[in-house]
Amino acid sequence: MNSGPLEFTVSANTNPATDAVRESILANPGFGKYYTDHMVSIDYTVDEGWHNAQVIPYGPIQLDPSAIVLHYGQEIFEGLKAYRWADGSIVSFRPEANAARLQSSARRLAIPELPEEVFIESLRQLIAVDEKWVPPAGGEESLYLRPFVIATEPGLGVRPSNEYRYLLIASPAGAYFKGGIKPVSVWLSHEYVRASPGGTGAAKFGGNYAASLLAQAQAAEMGCDQVVWLDAIERRYVEEMGGMNLFFVFGSGGSARLVTPELSGSLLPGITRDSLLQLATDAGFAVEERKIDVDEWQKKAGAGEITEVFACGTAAVITPVSHVKHHDGEFTIADGQPGEITMALRDTLTGIQRGTFADTHGWMARLN
């Protein structure tokens, strides 16, 4: 088995996007609509370990129709962003945390772990050839990076694959909120659950997202933007919003307290969540990780004790929650507008990511 450092080979795309096409895309990229000229591919076999590290032209991949990923969903993924700073450097936010979470997901899905140094080097290799796809500094645009691992061995037996492929693709991403931060309305899902104790909820695994689609469609039917998941046992404790972690602000000003659902094994351990817990502490706020049930949310929002609610994740960073619907009624958080603490934390985190705030925790890693 290969135990030494991987050497990447580079095969340049002979038909890349023209400067004009790329600039047109970067002017209005949306999310997940366009892709850069190249991608990274690394193979795994039991005998050779991780090997055959390549940067190749972006394009379709070949899979045997009986590949295990297509039948039993053995796959994992991550999501992170690359930002261009004013000094020309291209950076990413806590990529080592994404590498660690990919390893954690791999353990849960019986997939061999990709070493952190290989993960980080794959980001650098892709940026080296597709640097022009990173949007200019000064705005909220970024280059979204999607690393993932799929089980490629042919076979219909239900077992872990002996062959895998790590892939890294990149897609320019526009500002999540255009024309100002917009709060979202949410539907509390009592009928469906995202994950249960002992399940795959703490892994970033496609099956979790596929299983969420019906509940998300139900939320849309109820006139809501997103679904909020409750625990699988009692259907009363708040877990996540869509694929994002939730925070509740009790009180206001310097005496405010931030509460987020504790990591129970059925929640994704969000990197943005972890970072906001640190930034809130830095700002002097009390923070607490504990269970919070729906009744407490509604009663304390009605009494004015819960003053702000927001969700957090890589794509939107922070999304304010304004209105909640459920089977027995609905309620609004405060005046339904983004809260002061919500916006202050968002400004701090995005400022660190954009290089306009001091990175006192050493979270930003240069990729070029």
Swiss-Prot record:
Catalysis: reaction(s): L-isoleucine + 2-oxoglutarate = (S)-3-methyl-2-oxopentanoate + L-glutamate; L-valine + 2-oxoglutarate = 3-methyl-2-oxobutanoate + L-glutamate; L-leucine + 2-oxoglutarate = 4-methyl-2-oxopentanoate + L-glutamate
Class of this enzyme: transferase
PROSITE patterns according to UniProt: AA_TRANSFER_CLASS_4 (PS00770)
Metabolic or biological pathway, per its Swiss-Prot or TrEMBL entry: Amino-acid biosynthesis; L-isoleucine biosynthesis; L-isoleucine from 2-oxobutanoate: step 4/4; Amino-acid biosynthesis; L-leucine biosynthesis; L-leucine from 3-methyl-2-oxobutanoate: step 4/4; Amino-acid biosynthesis; L-valine biosynthesis; L-valine from pyruvate: step 4/4
Assembly description: Homodimer.
Binding site for pyridoxal 5'-phosphate: R101, Y209, I271, T272, T314
Activity regulation summary: Inhibited by ammonium sulfate at millimolar concentrations and by O-benzylhydroxylamine (Obe).
Phylogenetic classification of the source organism: Bacteria, Bacillati, Actinomycetota, Actinomycetes, Mycobacteriales
Isoglutamyl lysine isopeptide (Lys-Gln) (interchain with Q-Cter in protein Pup) cross-link, chain position(s): K299
GO biological process, any: L-valine biosynthetic process
Cofactor: pyridoxal 5'-phosphate
Entry protein name: Branched-chain-amino-acid aminotransferase
Superkingdom per UniProt: Bacteria
Family: Belongs to the class-IV pyridoxal-phosphate-dependent aminotransferase family.
One Pfam family linked to the record: Aminotran_4
Xref: CDD domains: BCAT_beta_family
Keywords: Amino-acid biosynthesis, Aminotransferase, Branched-chain amino acid biosynthesis, Isopeptide bond, Pyridoxal phosphate, Transferase, Ubl conjugation
Chain positions with N6-(pyridoxal phosphate)lysine modification: K204
